[in-house]
């Protein structure tokens, strides 16, 4: 696994989505999951990221019940920083899970994880994936994006908005620079923390029943896993 130095900024504010020209990308994983979302049955869908009117509309137009939670923003709260037995800086995973992703077991039919594992602090990734497993129904689907080895530490973090069954709009997420709550002024971007290879991705989702990789494009590989 390839790691990058640097960290994200803690902030009381929500991530700001830049007004630069918006980009779109075709998503094979989205295309696959859209078949499930075409079901006449009402599904519970968890969209991890800042509230997206596009995504809410896409889900509700199909009769589904959407939930949204910005777990990445919550993960950079400086109050979560602690030290392990060796004195290494880690995040307090127990506190984080007590305050975030608090849903009944086997509650969701579909979870859009997007690029969360690539930008979240290393000590939180496995606990969060474990929590996602527990709140996803057996047979439920999870979609995640992972950067390839060609991506650098400054690879921008995007919020993905669903335009149609296989097309996503990408908006660069920027955190307002400030020095409040111990944040370092001038650090305004989520930084790519690591690059997972296929073996690491398989290990991350080892408790899931099935995993499917889609052909990577734009230095991003898409992964769909089944609970």
Residue ranges and their predicted role:
Residues 116:
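Hydrophobic adenine-recognition pocket in adenosine-nucleotide-binding enzymes
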Residues 42-44:
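Nucleotide donor/acceptor-binding cores
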Residues 1-37, 52-102, 141-227:
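Class I (Rossmann-like) S-adenosyl-L-methionine-dependent methyltransferase catalytic domain
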Residues 124-141:
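A short glycine-rich, Lys/Arg-flanked "PGG" loop and its adjoining helix->strand segment in the class I
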Residues 46-49:
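Conserved S-adenosyl-L-methionine
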Residues 111-112:
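Hydrophobic beta-strand segment of the Class I
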